[in-house]
Each structure stands twice: as structure tokens, then as C-alpha cells.
């Protein structure tokens, strides 16, 4: 069953019925002011940090679902009937409904009782405000007298405190209303210099700023008293629940239309200009008022929306492809890079599965997000790398996350994840290949614990590698610490207390529990760093880290090979995990992908055998499982992984993040059909026809899909904020299509499915444009046999760097 369709020409997903299996959301904003919005206008907004600067409220896991948002109500003043153009929250039957989720904007349109309404929501580039543009048309044969009511419930800034500290918060809320603008200024008198505002372009028939006055006692968003009676209470909030509502009234002749603009925004005043007059408690509106006036104009809104769409066209021009597969085309050209931008901005902090309170910018997560983002906005990627490096500790370890507002690292989600530092090496390597900006390696960056002074980024990378090589276990494999990439494989935790966090509880000591996965990751990172060292003229460093990579590869093949696949780890007692000798948890996906990606097993047959084991033991029609057999009881020595019911999350689901590692590995060994087959299984567009099973959005990747051990096999969860986005873009574009940036040029080395006759692509790379045509005349899953650059045959598959501003014609033939 489908709930909509793709509009590829407009880069939109069109939802044609409002009752999607779960709310299907989109993100507003691209830089500092952000929001999530569902297909029925649910969601909320924040400035930079969804915990510390939350602008509007939203209630998770609530009944009814998706409660609270950017609501507009229309009321026929002649009959007294009212409804929501977005369906929620009134849920009246609509004669027509459509939601178009686009790139950083959402447009919801509907018709009821002969009145057509369209609401466009977006954040203009460079602004700290969002626009709600309402257009209403009278399609009746008679005049209509209408009222439009807006609704936005303010959060008292700190989302965690707002949801828990009621004894204080019921008495702190403050607002001002001036010239039709509602200003939310809780705590502005004392500790804050920022406020929110809510404005309307129409002369107001009324307003409300106290939620209970707007809704009425014991009423919900579905039947607000003010809307029902058609008259605002003109309430001014003092404590309780500050809320913003405007009442605009207008009359439309048959065929006439009306446009009303609502603005919800955030503003900061300089500390010495907070009040007007100085010394009073009255908000100084002089600086923000010109911004409000400008954006309440229709021509400003129209121009701002054009700029937003133009900016996305420019960003996505970094790579466009035309392949024989529509699902591939729309994901590569639009939705996958769009999701990569969202994960870059949000990390894992804010979605309908992440509350925006407990998680900030994850170290490991954001390093991997760079892989899919760097070609879109290299300058922003550079800034993120330096932020991440400043979260590193002098030991070479790193805080597991930091807050986006303060940039300060913290242990709120635990510490001692021993894979974290290695991802920084790979993130920097991806940036260097895309940009050639080796100057970043000389940039001085402080360590988060300030035990040493600022050091060049190059040294940070060295310490990342040393952190691993200094922490080896009995088999000379890396110690796992609290966990590696798999946060739920907690081999030093031994948690038996109900409610205790596996991520933050104290670990037992003893350097025994080892990770084969980190071994593969280290070999890959050390090899990449050796290449960086070579380019810096540091031959000794390069030789040393190549030797370290070889040593680790030897340890993995000696102690991490189980006969048909790579083992997963050794536990606190030195017992093997991920082995045929285990009753459950015999084979894990992570080391099969990572070890092969690092080159381990490519020359001795281990890689091919490990991938064959993946096909026979882990692959399903919905994707590749993380582990099999799933754990059926809780194992104290394994931790959180065994706490999940079989088939969910890390315990036997299709954990989509790891699937692309196997796609890359299959491409590396020349198996184009296998690589592309795995790609299609979790491609959201390819799963659109089973939306009633998949349930999550068909235009973005989800973190997990329930496995066959689960009652709801095929059901996705945790959509949007997942490393799946970056890694799938890497797998399809860099390894299956084979277009990947390298320091000395652009590699064109596809490994295609045999059914394809070829494809074309346009890649913007270091200022030049590469027009690429790949032909597969014999319909084989082979490698490039012939490569021509501007009509000249080139040996190998590396297209040399071209001068900025030039266009290069690349012709490749698979044979």
C-alpha cells in the first residue's frame, strides 16, 4: 500500500492521505534555526540546540499521536463550522488533501466546504525565523466570511526543564503583545537576551497568549474554545502555558483568494540593549521590528522561497546521475544527499524518535556523516571537523558527544567508546580527498580537557591512532572499552539493576574484552593516515602506520577469523563472540564489512568466504541482519544487545547502517549484482509499495528494519537520523557507480549490476565539472576496461585533476 508518490521533477514527496502509518516528517532550516514538521503540521522549532533553545512545545509518545504543532484553523463564520487545513488536529473529513515535503520546506493543501487552503512552511536562508504562508480561495458560488486562527505553544527554552520542573515553570511564563506581534520573553528580565515572536500580516480581530484561554478548560487542540465561538479572548499569559494565537477575519467573493503570512522567529538583543526604555522591564523591539516588517511582505516571502530552492539546486549539482533504475536516480540525485544534510545538522539529536534532550552532536556519528556531506558544502564540513577535533581529549580519546549550542563535550551518553577517535581520521581523509585542503592539517586545535595546549590537526589524528594502538588486549586486538560502533555490545558492563543505563554505568576494569571490528577499523584508518603522512613528506610516519596496519591485519586474521567469517569480539573472560562455537550470536555483520573494507582477507580468500557467509546466514529480502541467531535471553556479559527482543534493534534486526559496508565490500571483490541487490533491499524508494509494512517515510533511510525473528518483520523505526544515509550514498556513488574523490584526481571505477547497459553522471569536483559516461555493452558485472578523458585514453581508472572552471569529458567502458 502507498500513501503518496514521488514528484521527481519538483524534488518533492507527495502524500495524498493524512493518516500515514506514523507521522511522516520533514525538516525546516539549514543553518541555525530549525524545525521538524509532519505531514499534518505537527512538530516544533528550535534555535541551534533543541534542548537549550527550544522555541515551541511538542509532546512525544502522546495520544493522539503527533500532538502539537504549527496549526492553523479556518472557520466559516456564517455556519460556525471550523476545520484544520492540515487535517490535524481537528481531523475533519477533507474533500481533498495533499502534503508536499520538499527540500527544507513543506506545503500542505486541502479543500473543505468549497474553501481551498494551502500552507507553505519554510525557513528563509540566513534568517532565524520561519514563514507560514496561508493562501485561501473561495471556490463556492457564494461569498464566504472566514476567520483564520493561528496556534503555536511556546516552550520555556530548556526542553528538559520545561517538561519536568512544573513547580517553577507554572509561574515564570511571560509575554508582551505590541502592534499585533506576540513576544514570548520568559526569563528575559533576568538571565536571557533572547526571545521568540509570532506575527501576522493581517490586522487582528483578536489574539491569545494563554493556552487554557485559547483551548478552554479540559479541551484539546481538536476543539479550541476560541475557534469554536469565533472570538479570541485577548488573553495575556502570566505563568502557566504561554501560547501564541492570532485571529484574522476576511470576506471572499466567489473565486477570490487571500494570502496571510505568519512569522514565528527567534531574536537576540545585545545585553546593553535589552529594554526600551532602559531600566524598564519592557522588551526592546527596535532591532527585530524591521525584520518582522520585511518578512510580512508577500514579495519578501516569495523571494526568500526562491532563494531556498535555488540554494538546494546548487548544492545538489555536486553530483547528478542518470541510471536505468528510478529508485537509484531519485535517491542519489535528491533524497539521499538531502538526508545527509539533515544528519549533518542534527547528528542524532532531533527527530520523532529522538527527543532533542539527551543527545547532542555525536563524535562517531558526525565523523561518518561527513562522508555523505562533504561534497555538498566543503566549507561547513571543515568547520565541523575542527569542532570535533576540539572535543578530543589529550589521551587521543574523545567525548562521545557535545552540545551544539555550547560546543562543550559531555558524558551524558557515556564515555570510553574505543572506536570513536578512529572515525576522525576517516572523516578528515574524506575531506582532504574532496577538497585537497591540506592546510587544515596545520590548524591548531585545542584538546577538550586542556591538559596540553592546542596542537595541529595532524597531531590529533596521530593521537587518535595511538589511542587504539596503546590499548590492545591478549590477542593484540583493540580493547573495546564501553563499546565500539555497536553501542549495545557492552562487554565490560555487567548491568543487573533495573533502569540502569548500559551507556553510563561504571565498567569493570581489566584489559581483556577485545573488538575484532575495531581491529578492522584501525587497519583502515592507519592506512588512510599513512597516505596523508606521505603527502606531508613524513615518510617515517607513513611507514610506521603502514606497519601498524599490517600488524593489526595479522592479529585479525590470526585471532579474528572463525573459519568461514570474521569473529566479532572477545568478552571480559576472553571467550569468543561471533563464532560457530556460540549457541546464539554466531555471526555479526559489522566485522564482515569493516574487515573487508580495510583490505583484510582480499588476498587470501577470507573476504569472499566472509561475504558468502553473509549471503547464506544474514541476508533477507528486507536487508542484511546484524546478528544471527538472535539472542533469546539476557546475557549479563554481553549487555544491552541481549536486552532487546529478538529481531529488534541490535539483536537481529536489519540495522541499516551496516548494510552499506557489505555493499562496499562486495563491490571491492567485483560482485556488482550482490552489491546492488543489497542496495535495493533497503532503498526507501524501492520499499514505497510496502509502506503499510515499512511504516516509516519512503523517501529517507531508517536506522533499523525489524528482522524475521520479530513479530513485525519489515517494519522500520528511527528514520532520518542515521549513519545509513551517509554510508548508502558512499556505497552507491563511490563503489557501485564508482565515482570517488582521491587526492590526485577523480576515480571512475564502477562495479555495476550485469543488467545495466551503463549510466551517465555529472560530478563537480574541485571547481571543475566532469561529464561521465559509463557503458556496459556486454552486460557484465565487470571492471573498467577502457577509460578516455577528453578523447585521450588513460591507463587505469584515475581521471587527473582538471583546472577549476573547466569541463572534462570522461568515457568509460566496462569489459
Predicted regions and their residues:
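Solvent-exposed loop and edge beta-strand segments that line ligand/cofactor-binding
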Residues: 351-366, 409-419, 500-519, 575-602, ...
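Surface beta-strand/loop "capping" patches
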Residues: 741-772
Amino acid at each position: 500500500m502507498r500513501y503518496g508518490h514521488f514528484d521527481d521533477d519538483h524534488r518533492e514527496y507527495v502524500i495524498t492521505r493524512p493518516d500515514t502509518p506514523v507521522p511522516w516528517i520533514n525538516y525546516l532550516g539549514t543553518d541555525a534555526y530549525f524545525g521538524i514538521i509532519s505531514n499534518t503540521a505537527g512538530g516544533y522549532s528550535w534555535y541551534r540546540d533543541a534542548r537549550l533553545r527550544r522555541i515551541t512545545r511538542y509532546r512525544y509518545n502522546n495520544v493522539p499521536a503527533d500532538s502539537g504543532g504549527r496549526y492553523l484553523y479556518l472557520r466559516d463564520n456564517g455556519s460556525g463550522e471550523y476545520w484544520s487545513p492540515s487535517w490535524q488536529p481537528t481531523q475533519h473529513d477533507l474533500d481533498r488533501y495533499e502534503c508536499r515535503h520538499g527540500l527544507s520546506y513543506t506545503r500542505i493543501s486541502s479543500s473543505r466546504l468549497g474553501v481551498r487552503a494551502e500552507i507553505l512552511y519554510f525557513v528563509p536562508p540566513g534568517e532565524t525565523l520561519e514563514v507560514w504562508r496561508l493562501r485561501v480561495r473561495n471556490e463556492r458560488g457564494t461569498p464566504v466570511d472566514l476567520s483564520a486562527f493561528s496556534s503555536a505553544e511556546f516552550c520555556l527554552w530548556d526542553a528538559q526543564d520545561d517538561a519536568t520542573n512544573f513547580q517553577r515553570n507554572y509561574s515564570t511564563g511571560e509575554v508582551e503583545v505590541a502592534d499585533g506581534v506576540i513576544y514570548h520573553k520568559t526569563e528575559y528580565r533576568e538571565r536571557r537576551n533572547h526571545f521568540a515572536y509570532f506575527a501576522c500580516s493581517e490586522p487582528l480581530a483578536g489574539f491569545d497568549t494563554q493556552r487554557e484561554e485559547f483551548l478552554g478548560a479540559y479541551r484539546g487542540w481538536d476543539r479550541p474554545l476560541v475557534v469554536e465561538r469565533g472570538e479570541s479572548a485577548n488573553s495575556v499569559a502570566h505563568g502557566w502555558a504561554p501560547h501564541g494565537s492570532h485571529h484574522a477575519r476576511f470576506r471572499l467573493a466567489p473565486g477570490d483568494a487571500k494570502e496571510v503570512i505568519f512569522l514565528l522567529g527567534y531574536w537576540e538583543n545585545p545585553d546593553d540593549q535589552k529594554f526600551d526604555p532602559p531600566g524598564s522591564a519592557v522588551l526592546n523591539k527596535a532591532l527585530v521590528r524591521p525584520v518582522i516588517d520585511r518578512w510580512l511582505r508577500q514579495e519578501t516571502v516569495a523571494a526568500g522561497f526562491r532563494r531556498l530552492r535555488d540554494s538546494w539546486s546548487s548544492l545538489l549539482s555536486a553530483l547528478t546521475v542518470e541510471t536505468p533504475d528510478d529508485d537509484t536516480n531519485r535517491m542519489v540525485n535528491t533524497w539521499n544527499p538531502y538526508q545527509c544534510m539533515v544528519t549533518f545538522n542534527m547528528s542524532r539529536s532531533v527527530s520523532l524518535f529522538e527527543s532533542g534532550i539527551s543527545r547532542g552532536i555525536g563524535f562517531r556519528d558526525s565523523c561518518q556523516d561527513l562522508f555523505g556531506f562533504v561534497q555538498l558544502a566543503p566549507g561547513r564540513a571543515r568547520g565541523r571537523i575542527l569542532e570535533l577535533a576540539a572535543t578530543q581529549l589529550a589521551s587521543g580519546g574523545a567525548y562521545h558527544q557535545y552540545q551544539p549550542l555550547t560546543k562543550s563535550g559531555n558524558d551524558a551518553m557515556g564515555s570510553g567508546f574505543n572506536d570513536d577517535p578512529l572515525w576522525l581520521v576517516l572523516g578528515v581523509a574524506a575531506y582532504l580527498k574532496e577538497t585537497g585542503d591540506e592546510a587544515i592539517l596545520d590548524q591548531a586545535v585545542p584538546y577538550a580537557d586542556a591538559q596540553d595546549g592546542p596542537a595541529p590537526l595532524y597531531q590529533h589524528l596521530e593521537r587518535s591512532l595511538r589511542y587504539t594502538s596503546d590499548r590492545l588486549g591478549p590477542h593484540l586486538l583493540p580493547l573495546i572499552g564501553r563499546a565500539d560502533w555497536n553501542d549495545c555490545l557492552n562487554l565490560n558492563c555487567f548491568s543487573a539493576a533495573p533502569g540502569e543505563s548500559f551507556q553510563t554505568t561504571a565498567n569493570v576494569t581489566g584489559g581483556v574484552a577485545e573488538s575484532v571490528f575495531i581491529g578492522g577499523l584501525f587497519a583502515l584508518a592507519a592506512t588512510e593516515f599513512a597516505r596523508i603522512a606521505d603527502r606531508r613528506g613524513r615518510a617515517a610516519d607513513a611507514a610506521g602506520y603502514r606497519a601498524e596496519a599490517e600488524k593489526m591485519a595479522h592479529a585479525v586474521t590470526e585471532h579474528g577469523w572463525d573459519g568461514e567469517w570474521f569473529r566479532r569480539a572477545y568478552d571480559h573472560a576472553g571467550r569468543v563472540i561471533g563464532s560457530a562455537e556460540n549457541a546464539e550470536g554466531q555471526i555479526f555483520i559489522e566485522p564482515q564489512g569493516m574487515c573487508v573494507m580495510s583490505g583484510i582477507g582480499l588476498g587470501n580468500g577470507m573476504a569472499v568466504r566472509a561475504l558468502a557467509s553473509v549471503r547464506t546466514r544474514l541476508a533477507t529480502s528486507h536487508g542484511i541482519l546484524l546478528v544471527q541467531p538472535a539472542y533469546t535471553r539476557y546475557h549479563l556479559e554481553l549487555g544491552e544487545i541481549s536486552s532487546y527482543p529478538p529481531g529488534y534493534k541490535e539483536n537481529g534486526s536489519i540495522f541499516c547502517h551496516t548494510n552499506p559496508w557489505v555493499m562496499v565490500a562486495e563491490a571491492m571483490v567485483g560482485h556488482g549484482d550482490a552489491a546492488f541487490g543489497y542496495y535495493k533491499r533497503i532503498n526507501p524508494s524501492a520499499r514505497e509499495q510496502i509502506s503499510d509494512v515499512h511504516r516509516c517515510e519512503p523517501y529517507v533511510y531508517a536506522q533499523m528494519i525489524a528482522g524475521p525473528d520479530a513479530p513485525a518483520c519489515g517494519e522500520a523505526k528511527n528514520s532520518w537520523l542515521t549513519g545509513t544515509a551517509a554510508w548508502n550514498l558512499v556505497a552507491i556513488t563511490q563503489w557501485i557507480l564508482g565515482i570517488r574523490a582521491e587526492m590526485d584526481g577523480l576515480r571512475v571505477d564502477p562495479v555495476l549490476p550485469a543488467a545495466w547497459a551503463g549510466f551517465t553522471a555529472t560530478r563537480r569536483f574541485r571547481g571543475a565539472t566532469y561529464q561521465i559516461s559509463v557503458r556496459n555493452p556486454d552486460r557484465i558485472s565487470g571492471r573498467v576496461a577502457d577509460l578516455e578523458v577528453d578523447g585521450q585514453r588513460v591507463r587505469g581508472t584515475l581521471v587527473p585533476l582538471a583546472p577549476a572552471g573547466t569541463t572534462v569529458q570522461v568515457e568509460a567502458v566496462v569489459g
